[in-house]
């Protein structure tokens, strides 16, 4: 029983060491990890990715004049 436990422990240690060796090349954090705007719930004030390259589009076209619905006098 003790021999099996020792073998299992050696296998587990070998797996952990191999995984840490595989990650040895990365010694820095990805900048996206620290950027709160790229997370799942960005705080207010964050803009969607690549939105600074797109032109702004108005929400609705505002016209300050008479329309058929208001029945005001037309200029014609």
From Swiss-Prot:
Record's subcellular location: Secreted
Keywords: Disulfide bond, Glycoprotein, Hormone, Secreted, Signal
Transmembrane segments: none
Name of the protein in question: Protein RALF-like 26
GO molecular function, one term: hormone activity
Gene (UniProt): RALFL26
UniProt family annotation: Belongs to the plant rapid alkalinization factor (RALF) family.
Protein role: Cell signaling peptide that may regulate plant stress, growth, and development. Mediates a rapid alkalinization of extracellular space by mediating a transient increase in the cytoplasmic Ca(2+) concentration leading to a calcium-dependent signaling events through a cell surface receptor and a concomitant activation of some intracellular mitogen-activated protein kinases.
GO annotation terms (biological process): calcium-mediated signaling; cell-cell signaling; regulation of growth
Keyword Signal: yes
Disulfide bonds: 37-46, 66-72
Residues making up the signal peptide according to the UniProt record: 1-22
The keyword Acetylation appears for this protein: no
Carbohydrate attachment residues: 61
Pfam families noted in UniProt: RALF
GO cellular-component term (any): apoplast
Organism: Arabidopsis thaliana (Mouse-ear cress)
């Amino acid at each position: 029983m003790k021999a099996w436990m020792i073998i299992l422990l050696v296998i587990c240690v070998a797996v952990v060491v191999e995984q840490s060796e595989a990650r040895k090349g990365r010694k820095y954090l990805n900048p996206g990890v620290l950027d709160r705007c790229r997370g799942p719930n960005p705080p207010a004030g964050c803009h969607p990715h690549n939105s600074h390259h797109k032109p702004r589009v108005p929400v609705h076209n505002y016209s300050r004049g008479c329309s058929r619905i208001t029945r005001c006098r037309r200029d014609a």
